[in-house]
C-alpha cells in the first residue's frame, strides 16, 4: 500500500468527523427555530467601507460614531478569552470584526459565537474604529449566524491550490482565491465594456438561434441533438454568422451578438467545447474598417478596465495604444521560415513538399490554399506574439469571405493574433449569391471526401443573399481568449467559470 492511501483515508475520516459535528450544531439551531434566518439586512460592503474610511484616524472615526451593517463568510477567527477578532469576507473583499463578550447580549459570545465554524455566514452590526495597528474594524454590538456551513473551508483557508478541484468546485475556488474572483470580475467588465462600445458605435444587440437545423458560419464539428416534438436532428450552433447576416439583409445595418458557441472538438489550454464570442456585422464597410474598429475596441477596453493600454502577459508586454502589426499570410510564412519563398508557396508540388517537410499530412482533398494555411499555422502562428493582423487568406479556407478584386485566389480577410494565438477573425462578407452557392458546394464535396469540419449547404441562406446583402464587413472575437490576456491567465479554464470536465468516476 502506498504512503498516500493511509493519508487519504485519514483525511476522509477527519472530514466525516467534522461534518458530523457541524450537522449536530445545525440540529440544535433547527430545534431553536433559527436555522436559516432571512431577516438580516446588510447595508454596507467591505470595499466601500475601506475606500471611504481607511484614510481616517481612529479619533475621527470615534467622533463620527459611524454605525455599519455587514454580512459575509467567516474566514478566520482568533479567540482571546473574552474577545475575538474575525475576518469577514463579502463580495467586495474583507473586513475585520472585533467581538467582545461584554458588548453582545448575554450568552451569545460563549454559547453561540464560540461554537460557530469557519465558513459560516454571519451578519454583524457595530461601530467603525481602528485597531492599534491601524486596521479598519467593526466593534460589534450585534452578531448573528445566517447560514451554517456543513463543510469546512479548503485547507483551513490557506488557499485552494489543486487545479482539478478549482475547476470542478469553482465555488470553493472563488471563496479561497482572490485572483480567481478578480479574473471573473474582469470578465464581467469586458462583457459590459464591449456592449457599451458597440452601442456607442450604433450597433444593435440581437439574439439568434442556438439550436439550428443547419450549422454554419465556421468550419468545425458540431454537437448533434434531437428535437422530439419535430422529430428532427438539430445542431448546437458553431457560430451565429449566417443568422446575423440575414438580419443585415432585413435592414438592420449594424448588429452584434455576444454568443455561446459549441464545437465538438478537443479540450486544451486554448480550447473549450463551449465558449463565448462577440460577432458584429456592419453594412457599407469592408475589412479595413474592421481593422480600425478592432484596434479601437482593444484600446478602449484596456484603458477603461485596466487603467492603461499596456498589458503585461507573462514575460510579454502588449501596448494596445499602438497600431497592430500587419502581414500577409505568405509574408508571415517567409518571415518565420526564411528558406521559403513566395514562388514556392504558389506552386502546388513545392507547397506539398514544404508541408510534408514540416510533418503536415496533406490530404488529397486539399487545394493549394488549404496547404498554404496549414504551412502558416505550423511555421508562423506561434511567433505572432505582439498584436498582428494576418491578411490575404486563400478563398479555399474562407468560404464566407469576399474575394479580392485584384486576386480572386485570396479574400479580403484577416485574423489577428496576440501572444501566439488567434483572438479574432474578420472579413468583407461575400454577398454574391452565386459565388456563395458554389463555395457551399465545394464545402459539401470536401465533407464527402472526409472533412468533417467542412460546412453544410444552407439553401435558405442563399435565398437570403438573393434578396440582396449590402456591402458588409463582419468580425468575431473570442471573449475567453481576450479575458486570458487581460488577466494574465495561461489556460482557458481559468477564465471560464465552469469549464468542460470529464465526469468523476
From Swiss-Prot:
Q: Which Gene3D superfamilies match?
A: Bira Bifunctional Protein, Domain 2, Nucleic acid-binding proteins
Q: What is its main location?
A: cytoplasm
InterPro entries linked to this entry: Aa-tRNA-synt_II, aa-tRNA-synth_II, aa-tRNA-synth_II/BPL/LPL, Lys-tRNA-ligase_II, Lys-tRNA-ligase_II_bac/euk, Lys-tRNA-ligase_II_N, Lys-tRNA-synth_II_C, NA-bd_OB-fold
Q: Which residues are listed for Mg(2+) 2 binding in this entry?
A: 422
Return the SUPFAM superfamilies for the record.
Class II aaRS and biotin synthetases, Nucleic acid-binding proteins
Q: What's the EC number here?
A: 6.1.1.6
The protein's name: Lysine--tRNA ligase
Annotated source species: Yersinia pestis
Q: Which gene encodes it?
A: lysS
